[in-house]
């Protein structure tokens, strides 16, 4: 693959920003920076691009050398976690202004004596006239003059963002559109409507999703504009939570929550399929957390997810996150050793980074010899020119050892076991607890800390194969380059599966809308996928099945319904252990995804056919004792070569 310009694929994570660059000759290059390093640069992504183009500040970036930039970012996620979004006003029907705060009355901790109710993301709410019935028909008209005055009062109070959520708007968006038009005339900077944000049944989930969109979109837009200003006239794309790219101009807050991790799943799936593995567990261990995912032939997506204590109803890749990463803080609590959930982040980072940070999982690996300072570049400290601080780590572990009356190495190894247990439990939640047998799966390990813990996690889970791609340390960024642009259109339905054929026109309209939005981004539609979300009547458990035959085919109805019924029962039995053959199967919703052409995985050439030899020997603490571990360079290992441990395999 060759191009006359550079392409940049970037994953801006909580601790590190990874950049994969495709140069004009078709060669790939990798670079990793701290996401926050204010002494060195204002923005890590732009700093990485400057690094490859050899353009230091304050020179303008030579954008004529750039073909495209594809990014995943945690900006929206961090704003949600830290509750630093835009002040939002919530607009709804009369009698419903407290509905989102009341919610479903769920208690996250049912035995808690002191119940802490989550605070809503919006700061104020107003009720307006107008009403639709359950079929979307108007039963009370909007009083536009009165609504105009109410919105004007909000604007005068300083609100710039509003979330408009009206009853049954997913069936008829006209009322929300009229209110949004008034808000636009008044001058609100951010106007989110539920009929556009999440046109699905369930008022509470739809409303909360719309509020999240209004809360995060201004923050996200500021960051996008900041990047775009540094890269004028460059094709700038961002990864969405459902695993597809979109143009920067239409990137919304609701689609940005899993922007970074989604690139990792795409990268894991594409590289695993290229290597011949069809059933995988994605294991993405970064500095702050670990994301695990399940893949058995198709991307798993959830349309109702809770993120940072907020319920959202938009398509997201099925990712389970656990607060265990390289930066997870190791500490004691009432005499017990704990790992996480707090993280040292990028600043100050682990103790070994020489920025005054606490002991972390990374420091455990440094102390035990699994991370050797001499094999790392001198990029640490305030001036980014020092090696990892082994002596500082030893000093802090000695203090902890005095507290627990244990050897420092025993404490460090114990902390790693706790972290591995937490990560293995996360994998079990998305696999064995859903009826999948992991013995035939491959653990695809990636992320900056994945390679250090993949073997221990695989042993814990009974997985016999691990795939460590040569780009595993930057696989989320690499996944941005392999991803397709895609648009998903979802519509709620409450009909029996046996009546599927009657929805042909509605599904065709969804297809046309998805394809139109994709072509509006100057892309050619290469693939259209239709997915059904089914449930037993009276159940709230939804399973997804792909539609493999067109609905407008005269032969479709009977054969397709029979096939879908059998597949639904099979999947339900696998996951829950029983079926209900006499209960009607209902269509909850249907989604249509229009995608552009996929991108091929780059072949990584084998450097040698000779068996790689050990280049060094280093002390490593494993299984309760210090041992001598051989050191190998990954690029010098030959196919099918076996190694006897303990050993370190280095990937530059």
Model features per residue range: what roles?
Residues 216-234, 493-509:
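Extended, charge-rich low-complexity interaction segments
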Residues 24-30, 106-109, 119-138, 159, ...:
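Gly-rich Lys/Arg/Thr-decorated short loops/hinges at beta-loop-alpha junctions or inter-strand turns
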Residues 145-157, 264, 277, 287, ...:
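C-terminal, non-catalytic interaction/recognition modules in large multi-subunit enzymes and RNPs
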Residues 165-210, 214, 375-378, 547-549, ...:
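Terminal amphipathic helices with adjacent charged low-complexity linkers/tails
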Residues 87-137, 194-198, 479:
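Active-site phosphate-binding/coordination module
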Residues 1-87, 133, 140-163, 173-197, ...:
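N-terminal glycine/serine-rich phosphate-binding loop of ATP-dependent small-molecule kinases
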Residues 10-12, 16-41, 111, 117-135, ...:
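Short glycine-rich, Thr/Ser-proximal phosphate-binding strand/loop in the N-terminal lobe
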Residues 22, 31-38, 89-95, 113-118, ...:
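Glycine-rich phosphate-binding loop of actin/hexokinase-like ATP-binding domains
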